[in-house]
């Protein structure tokens, strides 16, 4: 089993102003010239659209890719997932072509005007309704990359070109409809990048899936967007780090949290300001529930059209379709889908003969069975809870599907007629549900997978495991030699093992001083347009990854050059990958690697670790725990949160976020219990206090009255005494 990472050649240096032409936006008014309606739904339509002064006829046919029970999900402020109260129509998405251009592709929605993409063979145009227009005006603009500097031409021009090859018939032997049910997650930064509006973001995801569907027409595959999840307030997992690390983190999260949302494959879409890699997935594992997933990294400068190509390539790789060898693989278009350069080209893209052969091999195997089930694509106009559709909706406590579905999975907790829990049940499924009851709060539901990760426990009142937490970034790890970064110990030894395999360890300082002072394949601090960058003295530990080899045989890494150097008795090794190699980023030290006291590597420079924002002092958790990524103390075993100052022998450790909080009081240790209850504001100890307050107030008032009365009596006595003495005083002679 192996995973595939995408390298986007040169994308890290792309700038919108230097790589994309500034193209004029045109105003057009689409004219509907034909419409066919079946059962109240417009199944076909034709529009006349003017592009650059020339009218084109666009023929459309309805293309459903949203199931009847499609929902968009987000999380509440308490971290509970909930469906958004929005209706999204599934009958207004269309696919078609431009008349006179048989190799053209059109993918638009007509829910609110025409919104989508028109692709000629090598030029693409975007179209969307003009806001606040009263005359059905639309804007249309060319999506053009400088690298695809070609002009629009029609079919007769295509026929006149000298095609040096002809495609053989390599269609899959079983030409039946196939379906890929996909759950898509948009993380917070990409949500903000796409407009920070649920309707706008959903429309863009619909357009992305529509474009991807157009690519897979030749395979007779429909990509079904089974559900959409938006991380609006915060990400549920750390989305930093390299693509392969993020893939593993996502798949672990997916296993715990996506059990209630049926899907064949799940994809996490992540925004990156710039990135060399654009995604990761496991090859040929489309129908393997443990590995059917991928991550798509969306660099700032690419278009939605290019993002669809990336998604299509990832889906293809997960079906065992490999990258094209441009010397052996051919297609009738300007560029083939599985050409790594395809994302740089506008226009229609199709699969090569090699891709057809790979797909035919995949579909002939048992491992492709998940593509054979057809979801319901009935039109829907308003979302309503439907008991028996295997989807948990508003007003339902459970929904295991039809009677046959529930019997198949052995459902015993859910009343299939009412979609309510049976008497005596409080859950039906989930990592913290057992025999229809919530597991007790001391039950671990997600163990830590390494020292910078933290375990989570069932909270005793939910079937779900709490969200994943990890040690705060910046905390020491690896015997205080390294630092935790987003839940992973950024160990030099681990980086060496990941790059070279066994029998390696992190290189000594002599190796770094000698090799990274060079400016060649053996040592450097990165690559720029002018060549290798020389490391300054302070940055030697942050340049090329240099390891110490203790093995006996020469290392073998495909498509890589391994450099050996004997320095001060150490066999130091470095590696040089081709620029388009999936592991090319492993040539250098990762960001977050320690490079000195209170210093870490960042972009091949050794900088202060203060930028990590680590502020967990030993006093905060009384030296009996660590801070988690929410900056709360995760206490060691037998010490209680929130500050790990109180001891309880039966407490397994944890934080206020780990699920097993608050702790159960231990009757044998009454003083400790009182202290704990004061910490957590437990109600049983507070009601006597509130009962005492009115009596205390009354007592104070009575005391005040008594004092005042006593004072008044003294005052009266003083006045009486003064009045008795006054005449005598006045009779004194005035001298």
UniProtKB/Swiss-Prot annotation:
Per its record, how is this protein called by name?
Disintegrin and metalloproteinase domain-containing protein 2
Glycans attached where?
122, 220, 353, 459, 566
Task: Share any extra remarks.
Answer: In mammals, exists as a heterodimer composed of an alpha and beta subunits. In human, fertilin subunit alpha is a pseudogene.
Does the keyword section mention Nucleus? Answer: no
Which PANTHER family does this entry report, sorted A to Z? Answer: ADAM A DISINTEGRIN AND METALLOPROTEASE DOMAIN (PTHR11905), DISINTEGRIN AND METALLOPROTEINASE DOMAIN-CONTAINING PROTEIN 2 (PTHR11905:SF108)
Q: Which residues constitute the signal peptide according to the record?
A: 1-16
Residue ranges of every copy of the EGF-like domain listed in the record: 612-645
| Tissue expression as described in the entry | Expressed specifically in spermatogenic cells in the seminiferous cells. Not detected in fetal tissues.
Q: Where would you find this protein in the cell? A: Membrane
Q: How is it modified after translation?
A: The prodomain and the metalloprotease domain are cleaved during the epididymal maturation of the spermatozoa.
Domain Peptidase M12B intervals: 178-375
Domain-level remarks: A tripeptide motif (FEE) within disintegrin-like domain could be involved in the binding to egg integrin receptor and thus could mediate sperm/egg binding.
Keyword annotations: Cell adhesion, Disulfide bond, EGF-like domain, Glycoprotein, Membrane, Phosphoprotein, Signal, Transmembrane, Transmembrane helix
**Residues on the Extracellular side?**
175-686
Q: How does it sit in the membrane?
A: Single-pass type I membrane protein
Q: Which residues carry this modification: Phosphoserine?
A: 729
Cystine pairs annotated here are 287-370, 329-354, 331-336, 445-465, 616-627, 621-633, 635-644
Q: Which GO terms describe its molecular function?
A: integrin binding; metalloendopeptidase activity; metallopeptidase activity
Q: Which GO terms describe its biological process?
A: adult behavior; binding of sperm to zona pellucida; cell adhesion; fusion of sperm to egg plasma membrane involved in single fertilization; gene expression; male gonad development; positive regulation of gene expression; proteolysis
Q: Which GO terms describe its cellular component?
A: cell surface; plasma membrane; protein-containing complex
* InterPro entries in alphabetical order: ADAM_Cys-rich (IPR006586), Disintegrin_CS (IPR018358), Disintegrin_dom (IPR001762), Disintegrin_dom_sf (IPR036436), MetalloPept_cat_dom_sf (IPR024079), Peptidase_M12B (IPR001590), Peptidase_M12B_N (IPR002870), Reprolysin_adamalysin (IPR034027)
């Amino acid at each position: 089993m192996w995973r595939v990472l995408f390298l986007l050649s040169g994308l890290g240096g792309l700038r919108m102003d230097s790589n994309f032409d500034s193209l004029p936006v045109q105003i057009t008014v689409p004219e509907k010239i034909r419409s066919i309606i079946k059962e109240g739904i417009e199944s076909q339509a034709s529009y006349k659209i003017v592009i650059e002064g020339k009218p084109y006829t666009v023929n459309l046919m309805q293309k459903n890719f949203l199931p009847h029970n499609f929902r968009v999900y987000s999380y509440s402020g308490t971290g509970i997932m909930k469906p958004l109260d929005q209706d999204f129509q599934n009958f207004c998405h269309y696919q078609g072509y431009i008349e006179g251009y048989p190799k053209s592709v059109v993918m638009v929605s007509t829910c609110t005007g025409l919104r989508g993409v028109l692709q000629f063979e090598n030029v693409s145009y975007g179209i969307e309704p003009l806001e606040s227009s009263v005359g059905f005006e639309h804007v249309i603009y060319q999506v053009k990359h400088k690298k695809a500097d070609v002009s629009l031409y029609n079919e007769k021009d295509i026929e006149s070109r000298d095609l040096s090859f002809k495609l053989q018939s390599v269609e899959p032997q079983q030409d039946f409809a196939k379906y890929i049910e996909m759950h898509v997650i948009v993380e917070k930064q990409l949500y903000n990048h796409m407009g920070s509006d649920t309707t706008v973001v959903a429309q863009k995801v619909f357009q992305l899936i529509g474009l991807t569907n157009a690519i897979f027409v030749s395979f007779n595959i429909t990509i079904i967007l089974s559900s959409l999840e938006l991380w609006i307030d915060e990400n549920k997992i750390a989305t930093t780090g390299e693509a392969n690390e993020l893939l593993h983190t996502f798949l672990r999260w997916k296993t715990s949290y996506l059990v209630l949302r049926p899907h064949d494959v799940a994809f996490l879409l992540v925004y990156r300001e710039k990135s060399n890699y654009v995604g990761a997935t496991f090859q040929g594992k489309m129908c393997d529930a443990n590995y059917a997933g991928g991550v798509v990294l969306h660099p700032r400068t690419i278009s939605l059209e290019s993002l669809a190509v990336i998604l299509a390539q990832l889906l293809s790789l997960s079906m065992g379709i490999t990258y094209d060898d441009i010397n052996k693989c051919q297609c009738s278009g300007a560029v083939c889908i599985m050409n790594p350069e395809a994302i740089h080209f506008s226009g229609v893209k199709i699969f090569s003969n090699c891709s057809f052969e790979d797909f035919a091999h995949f579909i002939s195997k048992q491992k492709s069975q998940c593509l054979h089930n057809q979801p319901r694509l009935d039109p829907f106009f308003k979302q309503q809870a439907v008991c028996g559709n295997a989807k948990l909706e508003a007003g339902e406590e459970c929904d295991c599907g039809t009677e046959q579905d529930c019997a198949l999975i052995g459902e015993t907790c859910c009343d299939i007629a009412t979609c309510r829990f049976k008497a005596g049940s409080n859950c039906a499924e989930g990592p913290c549900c057992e025999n229809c009851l919530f597991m007790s709060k001391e039950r671990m539901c997600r163990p830590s997978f390494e020292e910078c990760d933290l375990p989570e426990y069932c909270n005793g009142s939910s079937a779900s495991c709490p969200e994943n937490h990890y040690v705060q970034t910046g905390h020491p790890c690896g015997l205080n030699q390294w630092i935790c970064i987003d839940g992973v110990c950024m160990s030099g030894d681990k980086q060496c093992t990941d790059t070279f395999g066994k029998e390696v360890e992190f290189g000594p300082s002599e190796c770094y001083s000698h090799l990274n002072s060079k400016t060649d394949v053996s040592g450097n601090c990165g690559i720029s347009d002018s060549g290798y960058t020389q490391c300054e003295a302070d940055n030697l530990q942050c340049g090329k990854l240099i390891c110490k080899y203790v093995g006996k045989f020469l290392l073998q890494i495909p498509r890589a050059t391994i450099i050996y150097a004997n320095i001060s008795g150490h066999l130091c090794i470095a590696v040089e990958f081709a620029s388009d190699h999936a592991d090319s980023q492993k040539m250098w030290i990762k960001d977050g690697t320690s490079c000195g006291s209170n210093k870490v590597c960042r972009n091949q420079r050794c900088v202060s670790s203060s930028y990590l924002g680590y502020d967990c002092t030993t006093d905060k958790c009384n030296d009996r725990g660590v801070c988690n990524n929410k900056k709360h103390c995760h206490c060691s075993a037998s010490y209680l949160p929130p500050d790990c100052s109180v001891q309880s022998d039966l407490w397994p450790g944890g934080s206020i976020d780990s699920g097993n909080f608050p702790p159960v009081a231990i009757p044998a240790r009454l003083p400790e219990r009182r202290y704990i209850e004061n910490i957590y504001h437990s109600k049983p100890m507070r009601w006597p206090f509130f009962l005492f307050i009115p009596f205390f107030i009354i007592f104070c008032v009575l005391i005040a009255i008594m004092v005042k009365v006593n004072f008044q009596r003294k005052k009266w006595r003083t006045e009486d005494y003064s009045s008795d003495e006054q005449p005598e005083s006045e009779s004194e002679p005035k001298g």
